A protein has these predicted regions:
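Alpha-helical protein-protein interaction elements
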Residues: 2-5, 26, 187-188, 220-221
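Generic low-complexity segments that are intrinsically disordered, proline-rich and/or Lys/Arg-biased
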Residues: 15, 28-29, 102
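Noncatalytic scaffold domains of N-terminal-nucleophile
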Residues: 36-59, 64-230, 234-266
């Protein structure tokens, strides 16, 4: 969850990268909030690297939208227990001088391989089942926000994430706790391998590099954000969930601008 002067976005991943447990997501926000002010702009996020690296976007000539995308990107790298590129995105944007805010809905839908009869067999959302995965809307949301309101090239933002993935960062207390709590679910999954050693979560302060995620971001920088939903990445996503999400499901997804609900309370 990232806040800026112009954007609020929630990016929650049900399965891809790491599971986001909503209670822990809220706890992370309550426990630590990192604020950075540069000129007339303020960035607030749950992780100091998300805030500090996001602030660089202003120095690069970007606006609040660019900075919010960057903050969201970095948060998914350093705190995958809160969000990531496998999640969705909702944005509420108020442009100075305009009468009402813009609302972007970039939440993905269930795959065409899911039907109501199949879901009746579950009492709760099955976190370890492909049918719990919906089309990831976050990347499409970044694309739409950047195209409509962004000021700098999206690749300049992606490069900040690529650099961090390859240079590495230290495991935070919050990430360590989440990894420990979900050891049984995550340690045996490919996306979880880098975070564990000898069946134990990496210690606080351990420096980790997210090389595979960096390569994914490089593909997006080379081929465009929407290539996430097609080609090499799209096929890999579909295959990883046993084609419950088809390539057509991914390629047909688009973000939607909607009229926001509001009420006068004073």
């Amino acid at each position: 969850c990232e806040y800026s002067s112009a954007l609020i976005s929630f990016n929650i991943s049900p399965l891809t990268e790491l599971y986001c447990i909503f209670v822990e997501f809220i706890q992370a926000i309550i426990l630590k909030i990192y604020t950075y002010k540069i000129m007339n702009n303020v960035i607030v996020s749950p992780h100091y690297l998300s805030t500090s690296i996001g602030s660089k976007v202003f120095e690069m000539g970007g606006n609040a939208i660019d900075a919010a995308i960057a903050t969201n990107l970095i948060q998914g790298i350093v705190a995958p227990e809160t969000c990531g590129i496998g999640g969705d995105l909702f944005a509420l944007i108020w442009i100075p001088g305009e009468k009402e805010p813009h609302y972007l809905d970039s939440a993905g839908f269930a795959g065409s391989g899911v039907n109501a009869d199949d879901l009746k067999n579950f009492n709760t959302i099955p976190l370890n089942h492909p049918m719990s995965v919906t089309v990831p809307g976050a990347i499409a949301g970044w694309h739409e926000l950047s195209q409509k309101f962004g000021k700098i090239d999206i690749n300049d933002i992606l490069n900040l994430g690529i650099e961090l993935c390859h240079n590495g960062f230290e495991i935070s207390e919050e990430l360590h706790q989440s990894l420990t709590h979900h050891l049984d679910e995550l340690s045996g999954q490919p996306s979880g391998y880098p975070f564990y050693r000898n069946d134990q979560a990496l210690d606080v302060g351990y420096k980790i590099r997210r090389v595979q995620l960096g390569r994914t971001l490089e593909l997006l920088a080379n081929n465009g954000l929407m290539s996430f939903y097609s080609g090499e990445i799209g096929k890999a996503i579909s295959e990883s969930v046993d084609n419950v999400l088809t390539l057509n499901d991914l390629e047909s997804f688009t973000s939607t601008w909607r009229k926001p609900l509001y009420s006068n309370i004073y």
